[in-house]
């Protein structure tokens, strides 16, 4: 469970780090949002180093969690309800992530 929490925190840091520059570029927010955006991306990179597996495996498994978090962000922040296809895609991605993360060692 600790690993899944770390993946969720990593995804949140990346999404926030990308969303803040988006607010500046597309929504007219102050350029000051770039500072916490850059800090969030730095935290994201640091969090990736805390994952216990080899980097390639971490990145592959992290992709599934990122997809799930991005769809949750779509709903919570953008106010767009996910379609059944979005939910199916998340299920497939998380299934792949689970196979990679919880494989026998």
UniProtKB/Swiss-Prot annotation:
Keywords: Cell inner membrane, Cell membrane, Membrane, Plasmid, Transmembrane, Transmembrane helix
The UniProt record lists the keyword Signal: no
Signal peptide: none
Pfam families the UniProt entry points to: UPF0060
GO cellular component, one term: plasma membrane
InterPro entries assigned to the protein according to its UniProt record, in alphabetical order: UPF0060
SUPFAM superfamilies for this protein: Multidrug resistance efflux transporter EmrE
Top-rank lineage group of the source organism: Bacteria
Chain ranges passing through the membrane: 4-24, 28-48, 60-80, 82-102
Lipid bilayer topology: Multi-pass membrane protein
Subcellular location: Cell inner membrane
Family: Belongs to the UPF0060 family.
Annotated protein name in UniProt: UPF0060 membrane protein Rmet_4032
